[in-house]
Protein backbone atom coordinates (compact mmCIF):
# COMPACT_ATOMS: atom_id res chain seq x y z
CA UNK A 1 0.00 0.00 0.00
CA UNK A 2 2.58 2.60 1.06
CA UNK A 3 2.41 5.88 2.92
CA UNK A 4 0.43 9.05 2.25
CA UNK A 5 2.29 12.28 3.10
CA UNK A 6 0.41 15.56 3.54
CA UNK A 7 1.54 19.10 2.75
CA UNK A 8 1.22 21.52 5.71
CA UNK A 9 -1.70 23.49 4.27
CA UNK A 10 -3.44 23.42 7.68
CA UNK A 11 -2.06 22.96 11.20
CA UNK A 12 -3.61 19.49 11.43
CA UNK A 13 -2.06 18.31 8.16
CA UNK A 14 1.47 19.37 9.18
CA UNK A 15 3.50 16.24 9.77
CA UNK A 16 0.56 13.93 9.09
CA UNK A 17 1.50 10.56 7.58
CA UNK A 18 -1.27 8.05 6.94
CA UNK A 19 -1.57 4.65 5.29
CA UNK A 20 -2.51 4.80 1.61
CA UNK A 21 -5.67 2.82 0.85
CA UNK A 22 -4.83 2.38 -2.85
CA UNK A 23 -5.43 -1.25 -3.76
CA UNK A 24 -8.02 -1.83 -1.03
CA UNK A 25 -11.61 -2.58 -1.96
CA UNK A 26 -14.17 0.23 -1.61
CA UNK A 27 -17.09 -2.22 -1.44
CA UNK A 28 -19.07 -2.90 1.71
CA UNK A 29 -17.90 -5.93 3.74
CA UNK A 30 -19.38 -9.38 3.06
CA UNK A 31 -22.77 -9.25 4.80
CA UNK A 32 -22.74 -12.90 5.92
CA UNK A 33 -19.42 -12.37 7.75
CA UNK A 34 -20.31 -9.16 9.61
CA UNK A 35 -22.22 -8.47 12.81
CA UNK A 36 -22.74 -5.54 15.16
CA UNK A 37 -20.22 -4.75 17.85
CA UNK A 38 -20.86 -2.62 20.91
CA UNK A 39 -17.88 -0.69 22.21
CA UNK A 40 -17.03 -1.36 25.85
CA UNK A 41 -15.36 2.04 26.32
CA UNK A 42 -12.67 0.33 28.40
CA UNK A 43 -15.23 -0.80 31.02
CA UNK A 44 -15.80 -4.29 32.42
CA UNK A 45 -19.13 -5.94 33.31
CA UNK A 46 -19.34 -3.84 36.49
CA UNK A 47 -19.01 -0.60 34.51
CA UNK A 48 -15.58 0.16 35.98
CA UNK A 49 -12.69 1.39 33.84
CA UNK A 50 -10.23 -1.47 33.40
CA UNK A 51 -8.37 0.00 30.41
CA UNK A 52 -7.77 3.75 30.47
CA UNK A 53 -7.85 6.10 27.47
CA UNK A 54 -10.60 4.25 25.60
CA UNK A 55 -14.01 5.50 24.56
CA UNK A 56 -15.98 7.13 21.77
CA UNK A 57 -14.77 6.57 18.25
CA UNK A 58 -16.57 5.71 15.04
CA UNK A 59 -19.09 2.89 15.13
CA UNK A 60 -17.60 -0.40 13.90
CA UNK A 61 -18.88 -3.67 12.53
CA UNK A 62 -17.01 -6.82 13.48
CA UNK A 63 -15.67 -9.02 10.68
CA UNK A 64 -15.65 -12.77 11.41
CA UNK A 65 -12.14 -14.05 10.61
CA UNK A 66 -11.15 -17.65 9.99
CA UNK A 67 -8.26 -18.18 12.42
CA UNK A 68 -8.50 -22.00 12.32
CA UNK A 69 -8.15 -22.62 8.54
CA UNK A 70 -9.69 -26.11 8.63
CA UNK A 71 -10.67 -26.15 4.94
CA UNK A 72 -8.28 -28.02 2.65
CA UNK A 73 -9.84 -27.02 -0.71
CA UNK A 74 -8.51 -24.14 -2.75
CA UNK A 75 -9.86 -20.64 -2.26
CA UNK A 76 -9.52 -17.59 -4.50
CA UNK A 77 -8.80 -14.11 -3.13
CA UNK A 78 -11.68 -11.86 -4.20
CA UNK A 79 -10.46 -8.60 -2.67
CA UNK A 80 -8.30 -7.03 0.02
CA UNK A 81 -10.23 -4.97 2.58
CA UNK A 82 -9.65 -2.51 5.41
CA UNK A 83 -10.69 -3.73 8.87
CA UNK A 84 -11.44 -1.07 11.52
CA UNK A 85 -10.95 -3.61 14.32
CA UNK A 86 -7.27 -4.39 13.67
CA UNK A 87 -4.13 -2.96 12.13
CA UNK A 88 -3.65 -5.53 9.34
CA UNK A 89 -5.80 -5.85 6.23
CA UNK A 90 -8.23 -8.67 5.43
CA UNK A 91 -8.55 -10.90 2.37
CA UNK A 92 -11.99 -12.15 1.31
CA UNK A 93 -11.63 -15.77 0.19
CA UNK A 94 -14.17 -17.46 -2.07
CA UNK A 95 -14.45 -21.28 -2.10
CA UNK A 96 -15.97 -22.52 -5.37
CA UNK A 97 -16.66 -26.04 -4.02
CA UNK A 98 -19.68 -24.94 -1.96
CA UNK A 99 -19.83 -21.23 -2.89
CA UNK A 100 -18.95 -19.99 0.61
CA UNK A 101 -16.71 -17.11 1.67
CA UNK A 102 -14.45 -16.34 4.59
CA UNK A 103 -12.08 -13.65 5.78
CA UNK A 104 -8.42 -14.31 6.57
CA UNK A 105 -5.63 -11.94 7.60
CA UNK A 106 -4.00 -10.80 4.37
CA UNK A 107 -0.24 -11.45 4.23
CA UNK A 108 2.05 -8.88 2.64
CA UNK A 109 1.97 -9.09 -1.15
CA UNK A 110 -1.39 -10.87 -1.45
CA UNK A 111 -3.60 -9.56 -4.25
CA UNK A 112 -7.00 -10.38 -5.80
CA UNK A 113 -6.89 -13.53 -7.92
CA UNK A 114 -4.33 -15.33 -5.76
CA UNK A 115 -5.08 -18.92 -4.78
CA UNK A 116 -4.73 -20.03 -1.13
CA UNK A 117 -5.12 -23.41 0.49
CA UNK A 118 -4.51 -25.20 3.79
CA UNK A 119 -3.30 -28.70 4.57
CA UNK A 120 -0.22 -30.90 4.64
CA UNK A 121 0.30 -30.75 0.86
CA UNK A 122 -0.02 -26.94 0.55
CA UNK A 123 2.83 -25.09 -1.14
CA UNK A 124 5.10 -22.80 0.89
CA UNK A 125 3.50 -19.61 -0.41
CA UNK A 126 2.11 -16.54 1.42
CA UNK A 127 -1.42 -17.16 2.68
CA UNK A 128 -1.17 -20.96 2.73
CA UNK A 129 -1.68 -22.66 6.11
CA UNK A 130 0.23 -25.77 7.21
CA UNK A 131 1.27 -27.61 10.35
CA UNK A 132 4.55 -26.25 11.73
CA UNK A 133 6.26 -29.62 11.19
CA UNK A 134 5.75 -29.24 7.42
CA UNK A 135 7.21 -25.72 7.20
CA UNK A 136 10.97 -25.40 6.46
CA UNK A 137 13.36 -23.92 9.03
CA UNK A 138 13.98 -20.23 8.34
CA UNK A 139 10.47 -19.51 7.06
CA UNK A 140 8.51 -16.46 8.20
CA UNK A 141 5.04 -17.31 9.49
CA UNK A 142 2.10 -15.56 11.15
CA UNK A 143 -1.24 -16.61 12.65
CA UNK A 144 0.51 -19.24 14.78
CA UNK A 145 -1.49 -21.47 17.12
CA UNK A 146 -0.39 -21.94 20.75
CA UNK A 147 -2.49 -25.09 21.17
CA UNK A 148 -3.46 -27.42 18.30
CA UNK A 149 -6.94 -26.64 17.00
CA UNK A 150 -7.49 -23.55 19.16
CA UNK A 151 -6.93 -21.06 16.36
CA UNK A 152 -4.22 -18.50 15.72
CA UNK A 153 -2.90 -16.56 18.72
CA UNK A 154 0.62 -15.35 17.83
CA UNK A 155 1.73 -12.77 15.20
CA UNK A 156 -1.62 -11.31 14.10
CA UNK A 157 -0.99 -7.53 14.09
CA UNK A 158 0.19 -5.46 11.11
CA UNK A 159 3.74 -6.32 10.01
CA UNK A 160 4.10 -9.13 12.55
CA UNK A 161 5.75 -12.47 11.93
CA UNK A 162 7.60 -15.25 13.69
CA UNK A 163 10.56 -17.17 12.28
CA UNK A 164 11.10 -20.91 12.56
CA UNK A 165 14.69 -21.29 13.79
CA UNK A 166 14.89 -25.00 14.62
CA UNK A 167 13.24 -28.20 15.81
CA UNK A 168 13.38 -30.01 19.14
CA UNK A 169 11.58 -33.37 19.17
CA UNK A 170 7.84 -32.76 18.92
CA UNK A 171 8.38 -29.00 19.23
CA UNK A 172 9.39 -26.23 16.84
CA UNK A 173 11.61 -23.32 17.94
CA UNK A 174 9.96 -20.03 17.02
CA UNK A 175 11.64 -16.62 17.26
CA UNK A 176 9.09 -13.87 17.92
CA UNK A 177 9.44 -10.18 17.03
CA UNK A 178 10.38 -9.40 20.64
CA UNK A 179 13.43 -11.68 20.32
CA UNK A 180 11.87 -14.35 22.53
CA UNK A 181 12.51 -17.92 21.36
CA UNK A 182 9.63 -20.20 22.24
CA UNK A 183 8.76 -23.88 21.90
CA UNK A 184 5.51 -24.55 20.02
CA UNK A 185 4.07 -28.00 19.33
CA UNK A 186 4.82 -29.01 15.74
CA UNK A 187 1.17 -30.07 15.35
CA UNK A 188 0.08 -26.42 15.62
CA UNK A 189 -0.87 -24.55 12.46
CA UNK A 190 0.76 -21.43 11.03
CA UNK A 191 0.27 -19.35 7.91
CA UNK A 192 3.17 -18.53 5.58
CA UNK A 193 4.25 -14.90 5.23
CA UNK A 194 4.18 -11.59 7.09
CA UNK A 195 0.96 -9.79 8.07
CA UNK A 196 0.09 -6.95 5.68
CA UNK A 197 0.32 -3.19 6.31
CA UNK A 198 4.01 -3.11 7.28
CA UNK A 199 3.98 0.71 7.47
CA UNK A 200 1.35 0.85 10.22
CA UNK A 201 4.03 1.69 12.81
CA UNK A 202 5.20 4.70 10.74
CA UNK A 203 1.88 6.53 10.57
CA UNK A 204 1.41 9.89 12.32
CA UNK A 205 -2.19 10.79 13.08
CA UNK A 206 -1.47 14.53 12.98
CA UNK A 207 -4.29 15.74 15.22
CA UNK A 208 -6.22 14.85 18.35
CA UNK A 209 -9.45 14.39 16.42
CA UNK A 210 -8.09 11.47 14.43
CA UNK A 211 -7.24 9.69 17.68
CA UNK A 212 -10.79 10.29 18.88
CA UNK A 213 -12.18 8.79 15.66
CA UNK A 214 -10.20 5.66 16.52
CA UNK A 215 -11.64 5.53 20.04
CA UNK A 216 -8.46 6.73 21.77
CA UNK A 217 -9.05 9.22 24.60
CA UNK A 218 -6.47 11.71 25.96
CA UNK A 219 -3.68 10.56 28.28
CA UNK A 220 -2.93 13.00 31.13
CA UNK A 221 0.57 13.17 32.66
CA UNK A 222 0.84 12.18 36.30
CA UNK A 223 2.75 15.37 37.21
CA UNK A 224 -0.20 17.42 35.93
CA UNK A 225 -2.62 15.71 38.36
CA UNK A 226 -3.44 16.26 42.01
CA UNK A 227 -1.86 14.09 44.74
CA UNK A 228 -5.14 12.21 45.19
CA UNK A 229 -5.04 11.06 41.56
CA UNK A 230 -1.41 10.07 41.00
CA UNK A 231 1.83 9.51 42.99
CA UNK A 232 3.50 12.21 40.83
CA UNK A 233 0.73 14.73 41.43
CA UNK A 234 0.76 17.95 43.44
CA UNK A 235 3.64 20.21 44.39
CA UNK A 236 4.08 23.98 44.16
CA UNK A 237 4.49 25.12 40.57
CA UNK A 238 5.81 22.70 37.98
CA UNK A 239 7.59 19.73 39.53
CA UNK A 240 9.34 16.65 38.21
CA UNK A 241 7.30 14.23 40.29
CA UNK A 242 9.98 13.77 42.93
CA UNK A 243 10.47 10.02 42.50
CA UNK A 244 11.23 7.37 39.91
CA UNK A 245 8.44 7.01 37.34
CA UNK A 246 5.51 4.93 38.55
CA UNK A 247 2.00 4.07 37.35
CA UNK A 248 -1.08 5.65 38.99
CA UNK A 249 -1.06 2.64 41.33
CA UNK A 250 2.54 3.12 42.46
CA UNK A 251 4.09 0.29 40.43
CA UNK A 252 7.52 1.14 38.99
CA UNK A 253 7.54 1.64 35.23
CA UNK A 254 10.15 2.31 32.53
CA UNK A 255 12.13 -0.91 32.65
CA UNK A 256 10.53 -2.91 35.43
CA UNK A 257 9.94 -6.54 34.50
CA UNK A 258 6.25 -7.35 34.41
CA UNK A 259 6.27 -11.09 33.72
CA UNK A 260 5.17 -13.23 36.68
CA UNK A 261 7.78 -15.49 38.27
CA UNK A 262 7.37 -19.28 38.02
CA UNK A 263 4.78 -18.95 35.28
CA UNK A 264 3.62 -22.33 33.96
CA UNK A 265 4.69 -21.47 30.40
CA UNK A 266 8.31 -20.73 31.45
CA UNK A 267 9.34 -24.24 30.42
CA UNK A 268 8.40 -23.44 26.81
CA UNK A 269 10.57 -20.32 26.62
CA UNK A 270 14.17 -20.96 25.57
CA UNK A 271 15.23 -17.32 25.49
CA UNK A 272 13.56 -14.22 26.91
CA UNK A 273 13.06 -10.98 25.01
CA UNK A 274 15.94 -9.03 23.55
UniProtKB/Swiss-Prot annotation:
Composition-biased stretches (Basic residues): 45-55
Keywords: Ribonucleoprotein, Ribosomal protein, RNA-binding, rRNA-binding
SUPFAM superfamilies: Nucleic acid-binding proteins (SSF50249), Translation proteins SH3-like domain (SSF50104)
InterPro entries tied to this protein: NA-bd_OB-fold (IPR012340), Rib_uL2_dom2 (IPR014722), Ribosomal_uL2 (IPR002171), Ribosomal_uL2_bac/org-type (IPR005880), Ribosomal_uL2_C (IPR022669), Ribosomal_uL2_CS (IPR022671), Ribosomal_uL2_dom3 (IPR014726), Ribosomal_uL2_RNA-bd_dom (IPR022666)
Gene3D superfamilies with a match to the protein in the record: 2.30.30.30, Nucleic acid-binding proteins, Ribosomal protein L2, domain 3
PROSITE patterns: RIBOSOMAL_L2
Pfam family membership, one: Ribosomal_L2
Bias type Basic and acidic residues, positions: 263-274
GO cellular component: large ribosomal subunit
Descriptive protein name: Large ribosomal subunit protein uL2
Species this protein is from: Wolbachia pipientis subsp. Culex pipiens (strain wPip)
Lineage start: Bacteria, Pseudomonadati, Pseudomonadota, Alphaproteobacteria, Rickettsiales
Protein's gene: rplB
Amino acid sequence: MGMKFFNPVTPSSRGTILISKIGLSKDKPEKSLVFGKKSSGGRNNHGRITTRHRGGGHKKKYRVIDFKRNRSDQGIVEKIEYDPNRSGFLALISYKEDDTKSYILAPQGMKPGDVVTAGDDADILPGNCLLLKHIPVGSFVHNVELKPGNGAAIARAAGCYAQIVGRDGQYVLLRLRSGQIRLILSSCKATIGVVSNLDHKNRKLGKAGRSRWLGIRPAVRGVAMNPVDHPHGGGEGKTSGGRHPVTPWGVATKGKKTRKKNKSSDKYIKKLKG
